Amino acid sequence: MKLVLAIVLILMLLSLSTGAETSDNSASSSATALRDRLLGRKVRTCQGMGESCSSNYDCCGSLCCAGASLFNGCVMGFVAC
């Protein structure tokens, strides 16, 4: 019984001294990197003339989203969208 306890104690000490705990830290840092990438600032790009859109906010500058129901594209607007 004492031999089993001694072996378990030695294995626990070895796992602590060899850096087994650092694997948790690397997992934590990779989870943090993923969170930052997912929640970080999103770069919004706009669509140019003739590119597909779903609303006026998708189009750049004074372009408006217009077209048939199957294909909406950004077009030059002569009046406000």
From Swiss-Prot:
<feature type="disulfide bond">
    <location>
        <begin position="59"/>
        <end position="74"/>
    </location>
</feature>
<feature type="disulfide bond">
    <location>
        <begin position="53"/>
        <end position="65"/>
    </location>
</feature>
<comment type="similarity">
    <text>Belongs to the conotoxin I3 superfamily.</text>
</comment>
<keyword id="KW-0732">Signal</keyword>
<dbReference type="Pfam" id="PF02950">
    <property type="entry name" value="Conotoxin"/>
</dbReference>
<feature type="propeptide">
    <location>
        <begin position="20"/>
        <end position="42"/>
    </location>
</feature>
<feature type="disulfide bond">
    <location>
        <begin position="46"/>
        <end position="60"/>
    </location>
</feature>
<keyword id="KW-1015">Disulfide bond</keyword>
<dbReference type="InterPro" id="IPR004214">
    <property type="entry name" value="Conotoxin"/>
</dbReference>
<feature type="disulfide bond">
    <location>
        <begin position="64"/>
        <end position="81"/>
    </location>
</feature>
<dbReference type="GO" id="GO:0090729">
    <property type="term" value="F:toxin activity"/>
</dbReference>
<protein>
    <recommendedName>
        <fullName>Conotoxin Pu11.2</fullName>
    </recommendedName>
</protein>
<dbReference type="GO" id="GO:0005576">
    <property type="term" value="C:extracellular region"/>
</dbReference>
<keyword id="KW-0165">Cleavage on pair of basic residues</keyword>
<keyword id="KW-0800">Toxin</keyword>
<feature type="signal peptide">
    <location>
        <begin position="1"/>
        <end position="19"/>
    </location>
</feature>
<dbReference type="GO" id="GO:0008200">
    <property type="term" value="F:ion channel inhibitor activity"/>
</dbReference>
<keyword id="KW-0964">Secreted</keyword>
